């Protein structure tokens, strides 16, 4: 996906924000942000503390892939920017209403449709191809299958903040969205990192 086509535009003339927003919306993404390819120290420290306390339980892969999670550029040293995208999967009704039916099973909202890995990967690949055609730069696609700390990356890109229920929260759309990433070797203007707005609130945990 790194080969430029006849549509190539010089990098200096590319409006990454305007073009990315429009292209991402065309692919069905609700939000898009640009952050650094690296992980901030506060998130690295959080993972270290998590592992030091053996909170991973039987999830051994969290420990064996820790170095890549803390430094994503170990997987691609040329990476300069992380384009993080979110796709809404929220239902058109309150899913909590289903819990009132005590004798019926309840399937988590995210699992009621097609496998989101397949859906997002296909759309991200199309977006990556367009990006490479416009910039001539290389792009790599990630959808929850590589050892990336997606929620910290999303917070750094301004998409939201990680709530006490561990999911990413966006002020406008809540937590009902899947995350995907485009890593590129093109340095892009970064969005402002989102801050934690939870305070003393714990409604997500009570739910």
Model-predicted segments: where are they?
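Cysteine-centered iron-sulfur cluster-binding motifs in ferredoxin-type domains/subunits
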Residues: 193-207
């Amino acid at each position: 996906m790194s080969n430029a086509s006849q549509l190539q535009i010089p990098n200096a003339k590319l409006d990454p924000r305007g073009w990315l927003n429009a292209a991402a919306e065309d692919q069905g993404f609700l939000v898009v942000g640009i952050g650094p390819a690296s992980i901030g120290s506060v998130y690295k420290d959080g993972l270290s503390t998590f592992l030091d306390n053996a909170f991973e339980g039987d999830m051994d892969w969290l420990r064996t892939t820790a170095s890549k999670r803390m430094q994503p550029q170990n997987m691609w040293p040329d990476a300069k920017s992380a384009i993080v995208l979110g796709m809404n999967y929220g239902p058109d009704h309150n899913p909590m209403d289903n819990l009132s039916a005590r004798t019926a099973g309840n399937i988590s909202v995210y699992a009621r449709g097609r496998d989101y890995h397949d859906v997002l990967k296909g759309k991200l690949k199309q977006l990556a191809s367009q990006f490479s055609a416009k910039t001539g730069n290389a792009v790599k696609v990630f959808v929850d299958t590589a050892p990336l700390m997606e929620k910290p990356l999303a917070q750094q890109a301004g998409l939201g903040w990680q709530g006490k229920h561990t999911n990413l929260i966006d002020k406008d759309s809540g937590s009902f969205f899947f995350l995907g990433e485009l890593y590129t070797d093109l340095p892009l203007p970064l969005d402002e990192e989102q801050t934690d707005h939870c305070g003393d609130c714990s409604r997500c945990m009570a739910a």
